[in-house]
């Protein structure tokens, strides 16, 4: 790659990073063909403070410092149980703001791509629920389940739909409600201190100036490490709901998210830098 291309990719990376780390600022990103409007608009209203996260770590100062130092986490937002917020409702809130900031009407949306691994239902997916709740005409809705990289995959799908001329305005949503399914004891601290609840949305639209654009998208996977970050149950291949109910095993951890934190962190740092640079 030329130095100009490397700088371009780094610029995109930092703009996306800014989007996810500055939740209260409206943002407009110019990627050429596509104009990317977005805002992290919906966050869980209950938050876990530094003190609560430390308690989850067993009040072990060194372990707590390690988590904070490596992740930068100071608090985690969680949806208040019983208040009615779901992955879909947070996505709808974010989508409304993204559509408004894009300066278009909801009926100008041609397609919806929704990325999540914590859907309201096993099926149907949240894409059609958003389409219904926004009152958008019967446009297509696609759900993406690619874990932490789901929003990146969703953006890449929207990019291709726009470049091929199939759609003009694609609504992309990333929303997660993890807190209701996390092990909040010290046993689950490796995962629970990291994940929170929130949603972000973007509208990708075609512009007449086609001299710019997303130059390329690089998507990779390493399936040999799939179980290092996984949620095994319920699943048709291993443990279904009836298995969990019948066993009634309080020590069963298969229905909680699992992460080999050290392995995932090291692999992510190496692979992510390889792709970006």
Task: Name each region found by the language model.
Residues 1-24, 29-31:
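Conserved alpha/beta core of the MobA/IspD/sugar-nucleotide pyrophosphorylase nucleotidyltransferase superfamily
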Residues 64-89, 117-170, 175:
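Conserved catalytic cysteine-centered active-site region
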Residues 94-110, 275-277:
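Phosphate/pyrophosphate-binding loops at sites that engage ATP/ADP/AMP, CoA/4′-phosphopantetheine
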Residues 28-84, 186-270, 274:
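Condensing-enzyme catalytic core mediating Claisen C-C bond formation in acyl metabolism
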Residues 2, 67, 98, 109-112, ...:
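Buried hydrophobic positions in well-ordered alpha/beta secondary-structure cores of metabolic enzymes
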Residues 123-124, 182-184, 226:
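Short glycine-/acidic-enriched loop or helix-start segments at secondary-structure transitions
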Residues 5, 126, 150, 154, ...:
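Internal, well-ordered alpha-helical segments in soluble enzyme and binding-protein domains
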Residues 163-199:
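Flexible, glycine-rich active-site loops centered on histidine and acidic residues
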